[in-house]
Amino acid sequence: MTIDFRNVNTLWASILVETLHRLGLTTAVICPGSRSTPLTIAFANHSNIEAIPILDERSASFFALGIAKKSGLPVVLVCTSGTAGANFYPAVIEAKESHVPLLILTADRPPELRHCHAGQTIDQVKLYGNYPNWQTEIAVPSAEEGMINYLRQTLIYAWERSLFPARGVVHLNLPFREPLAPIPNSDTEKIQFNFDVENFFTEINLLNFPSSNRIEKYEKIIPKWQLFQRGIIIAGVDHSYNPQEYCRAIARLSEFLKYPVLGEALSPVRNYAALNPYLISTYDLILRNSSLAENLKPDIVIQIGELPTSKELRTWLDITQPPRWIIDNKGENLDALHGKTIHLRTSIEQLANSLSFKETISNSPYLKLWCDTEKKVRKTIDQTLESIDSLLEGKIAWLLSQTLPENTPIFIANSMSVRNAEFFWQPNNFKYIPYFNRGANGIDGTLSTALGIAHHHQSSVMLTGDLALLHDNNGFLINKKFRGHLTIILVNNDGGGIFEMLPIAQFDPYFEDFFATPQTVNFGKLCLAYGIDHYLIQDWQQLKQLLNPLPETGIRVLELNTNRKLDAEWLKTNLSKFSLT
């Protein structure tokens, strides 16, 4: 890249962009605005960085979040001064809570134009509170050699902090004085004459950042676990960048200890079922049977990452209070139950690699009870759902788990979508890759995140309800810049189905207007306005035919109209019955 010496702003911005490129940046999502002009031009001019313009800042931030979820590397977000950066806030929160690396560059007016009603100016310093891993205000652009060196080194540190010790957000506030456009002047003549580009950027791309995994010995820990036959492993919400290795590690620990693995639908373990002979997918339903819940009380729990979505599981653990060992290498407190816990600051992969199979432990009656119960409940669920011809919301996740092409990335929205997956997602060997926004568990940015995941990726799928999609329908504006394919499975039950499962559903007249909040939107017309293909699904066979194979390009919506109240009644009636076999 040629450094742009036309003026001090173009110099500053082009050095910033080239430094980030050398560190590994490939994508920048840019929202329109005047104060960010130097940054916009520098990113747009760089041949090795994809600069994607997106109008809506909230949508843009979740789109960037999706791209970063997929790659595990920082994505840059650029916006102008004023309230523009505030629209990034929900995505900043989600990125922090789910450990996604984002590098946010908010352009700002210089210090002399603040606190004096200069226009489009707010206090942007520490705009995102305590959510960033690191945040600072960069100096006003300067053509002095020492300041250019400062910029480079600050960017190196910012990049590192977005990845270590845990992935997350870094916010850089960047003030610019006019001229904002690349109007030539003589301010940069001196440094241009002496500037050695290659020497300035030498070895930036060779930097090795410290690993977030520490090597520890477990000789004293593993024998403690082996003392207990009544133990379980819980594989919670997780997005691994190497899902097969992650699942193999869990299976290795499970076979070493002869413990069943309670596998969350948002963990890859259900999609690599052959690796783990002791996989339990129906634990939420099993634990609704009070007799089984009592007989299956564990003496020890090994929790990998966060707890699953299941409220039944959480309540059971809270009541029984077994000692829990939590495997987590991000340094967080993952004990929302405030039980007797010990955190192991390592990864499951490292832990599994430390195991040595010196002697074989025989299967316990406790393990057999879990596995036998799983087979019975699984069979009942599968037979029940197979026999249902009407468009039942709960059947959709079950069908997807058997129908999508192998290795399909699937983004599962919050509220009822994630819970139906938890209840009914069938163990399989199709290596599906689950994605989700379970950091803060909101419905913000659902569509935009899914588009970010699918961008330049293989054909992907999103499972969502109508309210989550409507909350982010501006994401459809990304269509013209989107490269790839996304199929949206839209469960349209005209409102928030999850509230039908809560006690508030009994309280009219408040419930329908203030909680269920039906929007009565014609999604066919909405899709037409955005230029999106729309299909109204009439039966299961039509849905299956449209899901495999998936198209290679474009966005389409497959809408299933379901009955919110009848589906809720079906769940309330059947969830407990499944474990009574």
From Swiss-Prot:
Reactions catalysed according to its record: isochorismate + 2-oxoglutarate + H(+) = 5-enolpyruvoyl-6-hydroxy-2-succinyl-cyclohex-3-ene-1-carboxylate + CO2
Keywords of the record: Magnesium, Manganese, Metal-binding, Thiamine pyrophosphate, Transferase
Matches recorded under Gene3D superfamilies: 3.40.50.970, TPP-binding domain
EC number: 2.2.1.9
Cofactor note: Binds 1 thiamine pyrophosphate per subunit.
The protein's annotated pathway: Quinol/quinone metabolism; 1,4-dihydroxy-2-naphthoate biosynthesis; 1,4-dihydroxy-2-naphthoate from chorismate: step 2/7; Cofactor biosynthesis; phylloquinone biosynthesis
GO MF: 2-succinyl-5-enolpyruvyl-6-hydroxy-3-cyclohexene-1-carboxylic-acid synthase activity; magnesium ion binding; manganese ion binding; thiamine pyrophosphate binding
Gene Ontology BP annotations: menaquinone biosynthetic process; phylloquinone biosynthetic process
Cofactor: Mg(2+); Mn(2+); thiamine diphosphate
Pfam families membership: TPP_enzyme_C, TPP_enzyme_M_2, TPP_enzyme_N
Entry keyword Magnesium: yes
InterPro entries, alphabetized: MenaQ_synth_MenD, MenD_middle, THDP-binding, Thiamin_PyroP_enz_TPP-bd_dom, TPP_enzyme_TPP-bd
Catalytic class of the enzyme: transferase
Keyword Transferase: yes
Tree of life domain: Bacteria
Function in brief: Catalyzes the thiamine diphosphate-dependent decarboxylation of 2-oxoglutarate and the subsequent addition of the resulting succinic semialdehyde-thiamine pyrophosphate anion to isochorismate to yield 2-succinyl-5-enolpyruvyl-6-hydroxy-3-cyclohexene-1-carboxylate (SEPHCHC).
Family: Belongs to the TPP enzyme family. MenD subfamily.
Assembly information from the UniProt record: Homodimer.
Name of the featured protein: 2-succinyl-5-enolpyruvyl-6-hydroxy-3-cyclohexene-1-carboxylate synthase
Source organism: Gloeothece citriformis (strain PCC 7424) (Cyanothece sp. (strain PCC 7424))
